A protein has these predicted regions:
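Bacterial N-terminal signal peptides
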Residues: 8-18
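Metal-cofactor-binding active-site regions of metalloenzymes
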Residues: 23-507
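Intrinsic low-complexity/disordered segments
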Residues: 4, 18-20, 313
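Bacterial N-terminal signal peptides that target proteins for export
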Residues: 1-9
Length: 507
């Protein structure tokens, strides 16, 4: 027997008690979950405390609760249309009597107006009737938009703090951070069908300056958010422990020249600013322009991916249901987003079984390791798709990685605890399955560096540098510590494993 073999065997024997203990604590926690499935208060508390990893599908402007938005509107001296609940610019009517255009501040003393605004700006108290969930949901953004656009730091602070309170450690916020600068630049450049020439024209017109200014502005907002949360002080809020990155959010419902300019800006930002880890295309997939221009948008993504091959891409696709659009528009968006849009992740993916050759697509997504960002509450409220009608179990059956996501938790009146709770109650997931989804959220994050995991297909097998260490241990080996120091993604994953160990000790 060689000396190396003896050393390896000794290492196994040294680690075996810890590995058995970790396995036993996981099994014990799983048994506890099984014992409380029919006790909602205990189940809710368990899921709330569960370490959830990351939220990869979170629109910053939709993450803010209406109560915060009312405060923002009051700070800005805005008015509200009493009939529609839409914010308006001043001057406002007095609060002393019933008026059509009261100041937002009037709502503090008028509970009817306050509750009306909260209901109009969210899905609270919405009931199916004349207005669909889809229409009520998306109409909310225009109603509160004047307040959300001017309070970016406050929005970041509020959303990040809720993430921390919800036992998340990482968030990728979708945010159109340039304030319309790319759209203005597009207006100065004549449209060219040749994407290379269009890119050259936009760069010549100052796109790199727009990217630099956008990054500078967001850095200031990010720093201000940390001040609001009192990070670095004894009174630091829970959000201070959350790692935040951004996805540049392209508004695909705008004219094609603006969409191209925004996509280009997204690629430029993700290539030059560490805060921006990728880009996404947003706005309702069923609206006219996103449907009509879908193939052109994929062509734009295909071209610019060739120019910026290292930039990460996640795309909304399949946020559709039968009856919302003609049947033919249900048949290709997810596949096109993966194959031509080069998406590493798909947001929603609800209409996957309406795609041409859906089983073939599922196998392709599993082979390409494309993760689906699952937003259960959002899909129920907007599309009316839930329970057995939702494809989440089908994705899992075919080995497609998934992670739960909040989407627009402020508008939905939800949070990540509710997403996990809905998943447990609806699909009866085991504790091991919940851990897997949380781990996948960080595995498929766009953080730089190598993964802690060498394999995630069946079991999570550690990278060689950390193979001899208990995941999440406070004192990893020198080689593992060096690996973690060099790879941010692995560091976040190691942190999650430590949180799991702490969580499981309670059971």
């Amino acid at each position: 027997m060689s000396r190396t073999t003896v050393q390896a065997m000794c290492l196994v024997f040294l680690l075996l008690p810890g590995l058995v203990q970790a396995q036993n604590s996981e099994q014990r926690t799983g048994r506890y979950l099984d014992s409380i499935r029919k006790q909602p208060p205990l189940l809710s508390a368990f899921v709330h405390d569960l370490p959830k990893g990351g939220d990869l599908h979170n629109h910053l402007d939709g993450a803010i609760y209406a109560e915060d938005l009312i405060d923002f509107a009051v700070d800005d001296g805005l008015c509200v249309d009493r009939t529609s609940s839409r914010l308006l610019a001043p001057p406002c009517d007095s609060c002393e009597k019933y008026t059509a255009k009261p100041a937002a501040q009037c709502s503090y003393g008028d509970h009817v107006l306050y509750n009306q605004m909260v209901d109009a700006w969210s899905m609270r108290n919405w009931r199916a009737g004349e207005e669909s969930g889809h229409d009520h949901f998306f109409a909310a953004f225009d109603k509160f938009g004047l307040a959300s656009h001017t309070h970016v730091a406050g929005a970041i602070a509020a959303a990040t703090n809720r993430a921390g309170m919800d036992h998340l450690q990482y968030v990728e916020f979708m945010h159109t951070a340039d304030g319309g600068a790319a759209a203005k630049l597009a207006g100065k450049v004549e449209w060219k069908d040749d994407y290379a020439k269009m890119r050259e024209a936009l760069l010549a017109a100052g796109m790199k300056d727009v990217a630099a200014e956008t990054g500078k502005k967001l850095a200031a907002e990010d720093a201000r958010a940390k001040e609001i949360l009192k990070c670095g002080s004894a009174d630091a809020a829970p959000g201070c422990g959350v790692t935040v990155r951004y996805l540049y959010q392209v508004l695909r419902g705008l004219p094609r020249e603006v969409v191209f300019a925004q996509i280009l800006l997204g690629f430029e930002l993700a290539s030059s600013d560490a805060k921006f880890v990728g880009l996404n295309l947003v706005m309702p997939e069923d609206w006219y322009v996103p449907i009509h221009d879908f193939n052109e948008h994929m062509a734009m993504m295909d071209y610019l991916h060739g120019v910026y091959p290292k930039v990460h891409i996640t795309l909304h696709a399949g946020e559709l249901a039968m009856g919302l659009v003609p049947p033919e528009d249900l048949t290709f968006h997810i596949r096109a987003s993966v194959e031509r849009g080069h998406a590493e992740r798909i947001g929603h993916g609800v209409a996957v079984m309406n795609e041409k050759d859906p089983i073939g697509l599922l196998h392709e997504m599993a082979e390409r390791n494309v993760l689906v960002e699952i937003a259960l509450t959002s899909n129920d409220l907007i599309l009316g798709v839930s329970g057995d009608d939702h494809p989440l179990p089908i994705y899992l059956k075919y080995g497609v990685p998934v992670a739960l996501a909040s989407d627009d938790q402020g508008v939905s009146r939800s949070d990540m605890t509710q997403e996990y709770l809905r998943a447990v109650e609806t699909y009866h997931f085991s504790y091991v399955e919940l851990k897997r989804m949380a781990r996948q959220s960080l595995e498929h994050s766009f953080l730089p560096g190598q993964s802690l995991w060498a394999d995630t297909k069946v079991v999570f097998r550690k990278a060689p540098a950390c193979a001899g260490n208990l995941p999440g241990a406070e004192k990893p080996s020198a080689g593992c510590e060096e690996f973690l120091a060099a790879n941010e993604r692995a560091r976040e994953q190691w942190k999650l494993e430590g949180e799991f160990a702490k969580f499981e000790k309670k059971y």
